[in-house]
Amino acid sequence: MELETHLSKYFTLAFTHKSMSLEMREKLAINSSATLKEFLQTIKNHCPNIKECMVLSTCNRFEIYASLRHGAHANEQKSALLKILAQNKKMSVSDLEKCVLMNTDESAVHHVFSVCSSLDSLVVGETQITGQMKNAYKFAFEEKFCSKDLTRLLHFAFKCAAKVRNLTGISKQGVSISSVAVKEALNIFEKERIKDKKALVIGLGEMAQLVIKHLLNKQFEALILGRNAAKFEDFIKELEEPKKVSFQNIENLNAYINEYELLFCATSSPHFIVQNSMLKETIFRRFWFDLAVPRNIEKPVLDNIFLYSVDDLEPMVKENVGNRQESRTKAYEIVGLATMEFYQWIQSLEVEPLIKDLRELARISAQKELQKALKKRYVPKEYESNIEKILHNAFNTFLHHPTIALKKNAQKEESDVLVGAIKNLFNLDKSNANHAQNLNLYKCEYYEE
């Protein structure tokens, strides 16, 4: 009988701003729950060797995190997933192959921890990615595409990200895509000598809200075009100067699109919100920032409109992160240590229940024999308590060395064979299954002392 490893085989596929153009990232982007669920279901239906799966889709990356079944080959899963992506997104496998980064086992864990800690972001240290990963995990968990393996990985990643933020201060230096866009807008405002510090913001999602807050900090006024007036009312309660922000339904876009010199657009729409058919000639130059993926603004045909995409802002981001190198080095040390601790913890997960089961088996056996002796009056009833203590001390002493040896060997690759052999010898497979059933999958079992 083959013993299945208790260590999960983690696997990641990543398409990021480092390896893939904005045009290609747009094709991969998933912006609706229905589309995401359909995509994950396709993976589940066509990739039987993938146990658990989740997808992270943001403006700068499209990533698949998975755990593989025992004996599955990572390259085979990669090929299968690229075929699914190619068919689903109407792209070629060869184009995807050129841009994809695959990681397995420890390198996959290190990658997930780095992404969650914002070390792989366009803007190093931005905290938005952690929230995006939490949402991606929560969706996959609630839709039953991920379970124990990814729960453990992601919760440990969230702990790692918190440690990176707390110990390095990498998130306190105030650089984000939204802040860089507003900073560039301020530079334009000063160079162009624009009279009114006003901006048009299309959208009311997380990115758009960050833009609005940065604009207000720079003493701008903002008109927001959106679909949800109630959401706007809730949002302005967070603002120190709510009177500087007003709201109109996005259906009125045509009435405002040619009135503002500064425009920021960040919605989850898969189509162009701002189209050339809406544009009119103006005597002033216009500066537009499209912070969405897929892009929300069609490439303008008018010469006096200057459009900045997410990728256009990358050089400006790099100018702002030079002083983060020391924090980044420290952060990678934390991620490396967390990766090692994660695997040590995972390796111990099978040993701890086994030790508990062995002790419980010894206790039950001793109690059973004691009750027999009492029933046959081999020992007086009044000695029962003292005999229980003697038996308890006896099996604790007997199991002391095996317990130490099991914990020590948990760190070795051959621990799977040892654990499996002990389970078979003592018929403990069934009892260990109960531990899995009682596991709270929505809460990681790992707690730091």
UniProtKB/Swiss-Prot annotation:
Active site: C59
Molecular function terms, GO-annotated: glutamyl-tRNA reductase activity; NADP binding
Pathway listed: Porphyrin-containing compound metabolism; protoporphyrin-IX biosynthesis; 5-aminolevulinate from L-glutamyl-tRNA(Glu): step 1/2
Residue numbers binding NADP(+): G203, L204, G205, E206, M207, A208
Family designation: Belongs to the glutamyl-tRNA reductase family.
HAMAP family: Glu_tRNA_reductase (MF_00087)
Protein name: Glutamyl-tRNA reductase
The organism of origin for this protein: Helicobacter pylori (strain HPAG1)
Gene that this polypeptide is encoded by: hemA
